[in-house]
């Protein structure tokens, strides 16, 4: 017989961003708890609002499954003394399992007998296990926690109720000074405390108190209401998924409505209006059929439609205050000179250990100049890059960005155009922030891409140089994102820039403000980011081999790893890699010996290998390069079959090691083949 179990935790309002992850965490931990306690179930349904986290376990077994376990003990010769009596070793073993020597049997394993005992545990009724579900609630982790009242414990928010029901049966449990039962709380204003009749009636009982417990249902309600408003008013409404997910975690009973604002504010840049509505007020944006912004917005009330006109007026009033700020800053910022703002950046701290923003920009400018040549920018693009690098942070001191920091770069582009800067310079100011997330949009222009690279590279090198290096999940300065941005930009534009060589050149730059340090740590940091770009199905040993190659062109690394993973399925892969691995292993003993003297060759196989290596010409065609190297396998094998590399004659030995090193110098540009496992 199966049952349904409901566990609901009632709290003060949680931050919207915490709700969904916490709900999923509760589901996962509850599932693990039940499995650990040998309780089978059909599925776990999730519920959440800003004021509750809940799960319903459907099809829960009414008792634990029985457990039969075999335990292996000491060997028979240790378990029995000379008289055939059980020794203390045997007695201690069974005592530890809660059994007696009478339960001992012997089993033969590889010709020797060992003590075995079988322990049987009869499954307990589910009612006896349920009180321990408070362990699940205690195990939940949150990004922030708090104390309340005089309690010593911490939790995401103060806990008010705990509802635990097995079908209709309520349980009296203790959790954080709260007694459980069947009581839950309705909507803060429209509902009241209510009794949950059973696990199955949970949604209906709360719905009667103006709480929609299912986040999926709340989301569907919001979308349906928005579409109805869209049809009613003949407009087009953007339903941003991220905004929708946030809004549905701000309300327990959603009611969407349309509000208005004065059309005069449409003269302010659209990005300002959209930011005011979406980021600050959590409003949905309204457009016409052609995509033009309209002086309306959609908001979602936490409640029903009663007195909705008052709610609309209140929201309109709040938004107007925001739009007034935006209009004011837009007007006043245009009175500022870019040169004056740039000059003031010397008084703005980039980081107390690193220096000012002006110093950061100076270093970025030098890096950008170096990258311009590497990326093949023409004279006009190089000039645009230099100008952009000289001013690109100026908008941080404008009133608009001070109020709406999400608009940094975006407003820089607009103000730059108004000040007469050309479009390429203005676009680069906006694009240098890209990508703003792990999979965010990348720059479209070469000038913007190079400026983004230079800015990110100085940021990474500067923080590493003063010891501010990410550890574990801690990355307060978003250096992983910056590094991933560098890697993704290089990959998108396909620039043949070797990151290792580039970093070497950057570490050679001299600045009055800072000296770069920690080069090897930075390189390892980049390797980790490149690895993230590789196909997850690529074997780890291939990834390692490729990342240890002497080539650090991002696109080449990614393509080489994919190519090797593909070739690993071919018949000749094992023999070719093993041949190359022997070369790599021995070449390590060359110790810098590079000069090859053909006069010291003592057999035809040496000459053949030297000639074959000479013919290997690496190009941009990675597949062709790999084919050339794999084709050397029979020549390499013949060489090893007829040649003693570590000859007694030092000159001959060094000559043979140098020959092998000449091959690894070429093959090592693709991978360190001796890192690939062929077993």
Swiss-Prot record:
**Encoding gene per record:** glyS
Please give the PANTHER family that the UniProt record associates with this protein.
Answer: GLYCINE--TRNA LIGASE, CHLOROPLASTIC_MITOCHONDRIAL 2, GLYCYL-TRNA SYNTHETASE
Family recorded in the similarity comment = Belongs to the class-II aminoacyl-tRNA synthetase family.
- Give the species this sequence originates from: Streptococcus sanguinis (strain SK36)
A matching Pfam family = DALR_1
- UniProt record, GO biological process: arginyl-tRNA aminoacylation; glycyl-tRNA aminoacylation
Enumerate the PROSITE patterns for this protein: AA_TRNA_LIGASE_II_GLYAB
> What is known about its subunit structure?
Tetramer of two alpha and two beta subunits.
Name any one GO molecular function: glycine-tRNA ligase activity
Q: Quote the cellular component terms of the Gene Ontology held in the record.
A: cytosol
> What Enzyme Commission number(s) apply to this enzyme?
6.1.1.14
Q: Which UniProt keywords apply?
A: Aminoacyl-tRNA synthetase, ATP-binding, Cytoplasm, Ligase, Nucleotide-binding, Protein biosynthesis
Does the keyword Ligase belong to this entry? yes
**Which superkingdom, per the lineage?**
Bacteria
Q: What is this protein called?
A: Glycine--tRNA ligase beta subunit
Concerning HAMAP family, the annotation shows: Gly_tRNA_synth_beta
The UniProt catalytic activity note for this protein reads: tRNA(Gly) + glycine + ATP = glycyl-tRNA(Gly) + AMP + diphosphate
Where is the protein situated, by its record's location annotation? Cytoplasm
Principal subcellular localisation of the protein: cytoplasm
